[in-house]
């Protein structure tokens, strides 16, 4: 799922459930960082688009980077836009970053055959084709709708999501 907002559906559900303990902005940034390698692969014409970045090790390292740069960037953006929000803690940044990178790897493993998501533990991609691409997209969109409805409900009830 390169360069698509469909990855954001599960993030919206996580934000709705996790509240101030989950940064949706850092989650979104992690999605972008995860797809730098496939973008370079498309531009360069590589045979394998989803390489090391889409493995357990890659998700861990990119998650760490996403948390470290995502917290200060997100804090600055929210302040610049004067958006009322909970303080962005390191816990929220790390939760958003690591759920972002590991969910990205898992979702892409269902869709892309060129992955080795469990490397270095296992070679190959046993998850590919477990569900259809249409079912995967519906799942992600459904989670996004669920998350949005939950956030709206919390906002109406408490005045803050």
What is each residue range found by the language model?
Residues 1-161:
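N-terminal membrane-targeting hydrophobic helices
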